[in-house]
Amino acid sequence: MFRFQSELLLRLQKQFLSEHEAEFKSIEDLIETFMTQYNRGDFNDTIEMKLRDLYEAAEEADTTEESKKFYNQILALCPDEVDAKRELIAFELHPSFQLHQLQQLIESLKKPKKMDWHIIEARPYMRCLIDMGMIYLEYNMYNDAIACFTPVFHGDKQDHSGFLVYMMVACCGAANWDRGRKVYQRYLACC
């Protein structure tokens, strides 16, 4: 499972910064205040921290049914939480159903103005594309996998999402040697 719970903390931090920026002389003081309040537990009742706890519980659950229960609790708390939807889709047994559900999820999302891993709001969209690419790759549908991976390739220059190895496999499977070489060079630069 891709670990994205830290993004919830980043969302909380971003919200805190936007609300309190004018109150501080320096960004360092602002961040220090945020961290002090975070460490003191001042944010424990926020939606972001509740979501984090539910994601962790879902990840640590002993059964699929228990995990599903936690993901559904996440969606009850925050119906637009894309990553909970992704995780529920992953539990579906048939890959064609997973692909259909992921395609519907992608279509329901607002495409990011810029595909960039450094933009937190773009990451769920990019993860959906990676999920689809992985299913296509599993069924040797290499060109479809490449089509899913390509926008992420352009938006995740340092391979934070860890998909470059899979894109190389897709390029080799599709006998797309030139693109595969470029992906391999990027992979070497990231390591």
Question: For each of these PLM feature ranges, what is it?
Answer:
Residues 1-112, 136-155:
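N-terminal alpha-helical interaction modules that lie
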Residues 49, 80, 117-124, 159:
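Structural signature of alpha-solenoid helical repeat junctions
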Residues 49-56, 87, 131, 165-169, ...:
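"A position-specific structural signal for the A-helix of alpha-solenoid helical repeats
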Residues 84, 128, 161-163:
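TPR alpha-solenoid repeat register
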Residues 120-134:
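Extended HEAT/HEAT-like alpha-solenoid repeat tracts in very large eukaryotic scaffold/adaptor proteins
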Residues 143-146, 159-161, 178-181:
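Short, structured loop/turn "capping" segments at alpha-beta junctions
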Residues 151-152, 156-162, 166-169:
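Preference for long, well-ordered alpha-helical segments
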Residues 163-191:
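Long, repeat-rich segments with strong aromatic
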